[in-house]
């Protein structure tokens, strides 16, 4: 549906998903009347035992094997509207809830009068009708920018080409990031690092790739991670994961003031994205004898993670501070 002030695409109601066929990929594929084989996705998922998060690249490649084309870009609000106006429901990468790092959401419309975007919500009704959530564009963009405004365009090849989005190097670099994440989930950190480095070679300004390599180096306790996190923040100073990653590295290396500063900056960007960041900062405050601040952070940790396994220990620590 298209009017002067809004566009709204009609998406199918979908419930079936798998870690290798994430719901947004399945929804958009069905929108194009492409039925993706769930059994193939289930077979691929055996490569990821004990993993509960979505492997987006597996869903993308499954869709591509069934005739759709994909572009992964860093976008903008005007471009997002252009994509929707072209009849394509874009998939955007947004911050997750604690402690889910990220989640993908399908945007299927916008309303200029209300300055909102419409995103698909997985909620069943007896009628199976489409569920929607309206989010004010300024609030959406504040969240979206934290992960570089990553956007997945999935459509038949002729429709993708009609968009005339010419970001070939960026697209290839972003795809390599998604492949790197796949290997990281498989705990193949050597391959993950290789693909992240290739992504940076293609696009040295790709904040997603720079943060990704920073995280991989951080997991190896390499101080080289600092440079990549800092480069990521030069490209996107709202990159929450780079600030929190830097904070974690400085915590491990006992650089207390630097760690607190990075955690502060991450929390300023998004105070509800992570519970663990409050527990980490509380530990640092306690080391600096800032007990009231430590106590407040532990309360925030429990507020964001009410079912934390260490709840009893944390409650005891709060009483003792």
Residue ranges, per PLM feature:
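Glycine-centered coil turns and helix-coil junctions that link the paired helices
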Residues: 220-222
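Active-site-adjacent structural segments surrounding the nucleophilic cysteine of cysteine proteases
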Residues: 1-52, 96, 113, 173-183, ...
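Canonical positions in the second alpha-helix
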Residues: 199, 231-232, 265-267, 300-301
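Conserved active-site-adjacent core of cysteine acyl-enzyme catalytic domains
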Residues: 1-11, 29-31, 36-155
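Structural marker of alpha-solenoid helical repeat scaffolds
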Residues: 202, 235, 269-270, 304
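TPR/Sel1-like alpha-solenoid repeat signature
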Residues: 176, 183, 195, 210-217, ...
